[in-house]
């Protein structure tokens, strides 16, 4: 399902990031910190009253060296292009400024709903001052203290009220995948090569109102796929096309919509921080992942090149130990024929369900190999385990005391489950719960 998008805009130091984190905090709970994963806070998922939405802090996209007015125009352009709902943040302490009026004139031209959030209204006496903001012509101003969380619920109510009507659930039998990577890694060439590889193209589908073009095709076994084209959202991508953080944001949105993510690396350039950031987001959101090293035909090789590359990838992406690696060339079509089958296998792993009886046999065998840990004379006791979700496969292990389940032992159990049931290319989640 395509989540509607909410963009936060406003001049610097009005509290955009604080509001962003406050809204994100209404939903996000981090189960574990994974070494090597870089969290990017310009894009996340929010939820209120059972409605989910993507949330963008446009201020995080700015080039801080750009002229002031250019920065805030950039924000407004992104919001008007990408968002379904715009939250315009101003400061109640400073009142209406020239910059606020400048942004409001831009936003006034859009047909998108604009929620005017007057931040830093930290005490009741300041509420009378918000009426000056009616002069911006953007409707009722909402008083807010994002630092203290006062008024956040009203902002969220307004967001949900203005979200577009929910679309029907997409066909679960269609596998959705995207090619993600830095500019110039060869994504467009890979897309064209994959689609030209004896595929039956069903139809180009307008995936969203923001001109993201999805392509449906069917393989020789009749499996349907939807390829989510990140290059752009091509039309919207004309806005600050070369801004790396903007590219990150669009990639994250594509990942959100995907079942399987093909993380494309340029063999000529190697692994960059951008790759880790995007891969970390795909891992955290539970997507299936394939690491695709493109332009393999362009580098000199010897008998050790593949193993050296694999070692380097495993070292840089330690949190993706489950992700298969494939070396391809869009130019020569080397190994491209393997990609659809890999995508299909990983989608099957994402949707795999394990009967509780079989799962518990594996857990008991694991305990026999490596007994449960003790702490201060008390031993962890595992009663049983059960699978509670797919995409990604998620298991709850019921124990006597959650505190006794050390992270390393949970990881050991995960590895035993992965080995027993061949969960290729997908993260799996294990959660320890105290039996009531």
From Swiss-Prot:
Is Isomerase set as a keyword in this record? no
Q: Which CDD domains match?
A: EngA1 (cd01894), EngA2 (cd01895)
Q: Where does GTP 2 bind?
A: 181-188, 229-233, 294-297
InterPro entries noted in UniProt: G_ENGA, GTP-bd, GTPase_Der, KH_dom-like, KH_dom-like_a/b, P-loop_NTPase, Small_GTP-bd
Q: Per UniProt, where does GTP 1 bind? A: 10-17, 57-61, 119-122
The EngA-type G domain is annotated at: 4-167, 175-351
**Keywords recorded for this protein, A-Z:** GTP-binding, Nucleotide-binding, Repeat, Ribosome biogenesis
For this protein, the record's SUPFAM superfamilies field holds: P-loop containing nucleoside triphosphate hydrolases
A Pfam family matched by this chain, by name?
Answer: MMR_HSR1
> Biological process GO terms, please?
ribosome biogenesis
Which stretches make up the KH-like domain? 352-436
Question: GO molecular function, one example?
Answer: ribosome binding
Oligomer and partners: Associates with the 50S ribosomal subunit.
Q: What family is this protein classified in?
A: Belongs to the TRAFAC class TrmE-Era-EngA-EngB-Septin-like GTPase superfamily. EngA (Der) GTPase family.
Functional note: GTPase that plays an essential role in the late steps of ribosome biogenesis.
Name of the protein this chain belongs to:
GTPase Der
Organism in which the protein naturally occurs: Streptococcus agalactiae serotype V (strain ATCC BAA-611 / 2603 V/R)
